Amino acid sequence: AQNPATKGEIRWNGIPVWENKEALSHICFSRELNQVSGNNMNALRIKDYLQAAEAFLPHWDKQMADSLVKQFQLEPKKRINKLSKGMLSMVTIIVALASKADFTILDEPVAGLDVIAREKFYHLLLEEYENTDRTFVVSTHIIEEAADIFEEVIIVKEGKILLKENTQDLLDRSYHVSGHADQVDAACAGLAVHHAEQIGRSKGVTVLLEEGQTI
C-alpha cells in the first residue's frame, strides 16, 4: 500500500494513481536511500535489492541495470547498509534508469557523489532522455551544476511552488549581485530578492528581474 496524499490528487494521464496498478506501471519514484531505512530492505545485497525493484517495475531493463552496476564499480554482493552515501545514490540512479518508466522521479540522486560520478550520471540521464520518450523529474540542491540539462525548473518551498519556468528564460533574468552591503541594497532596491547572504559588510543576493526591469 502507498501512503495516501494529505491534500490534493495525483493523476497520470488523467487517471488517479492511488492503488492503481495500471497507472503506477508508468511511474518510478527512486527515493534517496540511507543505511537505516526503517525496513528490511537496507539489509539486502545490491543484487537482491535490484531484483526486488524489478518485481515492482514491469518495464525493468535487467541488462541496463547490470551494465550500470559495472559502470559504477559496485559490488553486487555488498549490503545496502554497508554502502557509503555516494554508493547509495548510485543504487537509486540504477533503479531510476533501469525502471524504463515513462515518468521517473529521482530524489536527490547526486547526494554524496564526487564530481566525476555526478558528470557520469548527467551523461547517462541525457542519453536516456534523448533515446526514449521518458520524462524525468529530478530534485536537487546543486542547481548551478544541473541547470544546463533541464528544460524546466520548479522551485518548491514548504510544499508550495514558488516558481515554474523554462530553464533558459529563468537564467536570462537571474542575476547574482555581490559587494558592499549598502551598495548591493541600493542596486537591488525594488527587485525580487530570492536569496541573500551577508558576512560582515559584504553581501551577496540573487535576484530575478521582471519584464522591463534592469540592474
Could you describe each region identified by the protein language model?
Residues 1-3, 128:
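Residues immediately C-terminal to the Walker A/P-loop in P-loop NTPase nucleotide-binding domains
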Residues 6-19:
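Conserved ABC transporter NBD signature motif
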Residues 22-25, 31-91:
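ABC-family P-loop ATPase nucleotide-binding domains
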Residues 100:
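Conserved catalytic motifs of ABC-family nucleotide-binding domains
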Residues 104-108, 113:
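Catalytic Walker B motif of ABC-type/P-loop ATPase nucleotide-binding domains
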Residues 115-117:
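Helix N-cap at the start of a conserved alpha-helix in ABC-type nucleotide-binding domains
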Residues 122-137, 141-208:
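ABC transporter nucleotide-binding domain
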